[in-house]
Amino acid sequence: SEHNFDSLVSKIKNNLKKTLSKNIDVIIGGPPCQAYSIIGRARMKNSIENDHRNYLYKYYVKFLNIFKPKIFVFENVPGIKSAGNGKYFDDLKKSIEDIGYSIQIKELIASDFGVLQNRKRIIIVGFKIKKK
């Protein structure tokens, strides 16, 4: 909920005040994957369009806009690209670019990095564009 989001932002800001730095250089994370997972969508055919989790990526973008890290890493399942016929992923990319980040998107396989799983993941790395 919006109240929980605001409370979390407030706690992070208070913790930052206690540190020597007032800035966050890197944010790493992503919303829960159930709404974007192809398996999850197959299980919840009738309710998936109304699932509030489809829009949790918007909170990630809000975090980026509030804390303005130099770099961020966003992770999720490959199904995020096709969920909602691609509209959520398109909106995610546009929203990130609109707040001043250039992004690179890759699909990675966990086992290529020593993880004992063959899971594929979409990774978005964003870099804050410096204003001239």
What are these regions (language model features)?
Residues V26-I28, V73:
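N-terminal Rossmann-like NAD(P) cofactor-binding module of classical short-chain dehydrogenase/reductase
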Residues P32:
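Short glycine-/small-residue-rich Rossmann-like dinucleotide-binding loops
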Residues K17-S21, Y36-K132:
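Class I S-adenosyl-L-methionine
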Residues S1-S21:
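S-adenosyl-L-methionine
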